[in-house]
Amino acid sequence: MPDKSKWVYSFGDGQAEGAADMRNLLGGKGANLAEMASLGLPVPPGFSITTDLCTAYYDNDRQYPDDLKSQVDMALTAVEEIVGAKFGDPEQPLLVSVRSGARVSMPGMMDTVLNLGLNDVTVEGLAKQSGDERFAWDSYRRFIQMYGDVVLGVDHYEFEELLENLKADKKHTLDTDLSADDWKILVGQYKQKIEEVLGSSFPQEPAEQLWGAIGAVFGSWMNARATTYRNLHDIPHDWGTAVNVQAMVFGNMGEDCATGVAFTRNPSTGENLFYGEFLVNAQGEDVVAGIRTPQQLTIAGREEQSSELPSMEEVMPDVFTQL
């Protein structure tokens, strides 16, 4: 394909190449991330690969334009400079998330990969850098599970079965009860399972991981559930999805970290009140997977839900005030 277009738009450190009115090109998520970065909000740096690229990808037998790789490499270098870490570096590794982002919301229809960039070497660097071996190996097992499912096509339940068996062997109920050594055992089991199913090993090269994830997100635009969703909601198939690559921020580093979702209004009633929920010591997929009961952000939300779990407003007041 000829080199003729700008396919990648960067954002972060108070600047962005995109804006909120570019959702047709950058997808809803990419456009809003760009807008928030421009406003100076603390958005982790990253870049969006455009919906036009998705269309070109399918128009040309799932082949990328010749100039895409160089644009991605430049954008990734910019993220490295902002974060002060390097993709694939054994001492100070940059880890990223790879997410879809259509111009309209299609919740749960397409694919996401977190903690990308971890391997047998960088996990040691993350453990040393964070001072938390358990967190590093927890992040690695999460990455292998998501990448194995989303990119490599190993059934999610293959990994869940191994996790549940390990918890049973250790007589634990919650994932958070498992130690660093437990996660190391599970990482080995996950990699062995991938080898058994595919006849090939889990990819250790971060660049290979990244392009695998980008391809999986573009591929998920045409998966059965996404296609059915678009048919049901009259969303054109030729709109395509963007891909958003962003530096990781970790909610699973301990009891003073969390992940969640937030709304400026109550999505059920439309009432103009801050609303949302969170999980302590978790990552995003834990919220949507329903494996733990989330806590409400506000006291009012906790009372509305008749929840006995304390709200963020009560247990993390400084973080709540920032939100």
Locate predicted features.
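Nucleotide/phosphate-binding sheet-loop regions of phosphoryl- and nucleotidyl-transfer enzymes
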Residues: 1-323
